[in-house]
Amino acid sequence: MTQEYQLETILAHAGINSDEATGALASPIHFSTTYQHPEFGHSTGFDYTWTKNPTRATAEKTLAAIESADYALATSSGMSAIVLAFSIFPVGSKVLAVRDLYGGSFRWFNQQEQEGRFSFTYANTEEELIHHLDHDPVDVLYIETPTNPLMLEFDIAHLAKLAHAKGAKVVVDN
């Protein structure tokens, strides 16, 4: 039987391991560097800090532990996270999204629609989202909460339950 820990316990112990190079018990912060390898073509697992570094690896392990997930991915920006999330959806996916979005997301969505990758339906309120989930085919529900710029909030758990019941995936940006 696996013991379940409270969030505070997970966070207090995340990243606590002995650093081989320094003996530090808490993971040091690695800002920017390149890494030495034993020989050409044999990586230590870290090449350049912009692809992977020990600090981000610790953060990803911590996020996975908090969510009881096998793994988590950290990206360099919110837009890169959105692009990464949408990369798993097939061409032609029908996306239901909140209308009040960060401008960069809205522009990227428009570009994707113009290129024929996805089709988007937008809703202004939670009631409209529920209506579309009940009546329209939806492959992906995309919500931003609180929204930008109007700071609207949505019941993520309720919307996710409805979307999952219809077989839709849910992407949440906050």
Model-derived segments and their meaning:
Residues F120, V170-V171:
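Hydrophobic beta-strand scaffold residues
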Residues F89-T145, K161:
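PLP-dependent aminotransferase-like
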Residues T34-S80, S87-I88, G104-Q111:
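Conserved N-terminal alpha-helix of the aminotransferase class I/II PLP-enzyme fold
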Residues T2-N53, E60-T62:
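N-terminal "arm"/small-domain region of PLP-dependent enzymes with the aminotransferase-like
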Residues H42, L141, I156:
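Ligand-binding pocket scaffold of soluble enzyme catalytic domains
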Residues P146-K169:
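Active-site core of PLP-dependent enzymes with the aminotransferase class I/II
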Residues G23, L63, A81, V95, ...:
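Buried hydrophobic positions in well-ordered alpha/beta secondary-structure cores of metabolic enzymes
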Residues A74, V98-R99, N148, L152, ...:
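Glycine- and other small-residue-rich loops at beta-strand/loop junctions that grip anionic moieties
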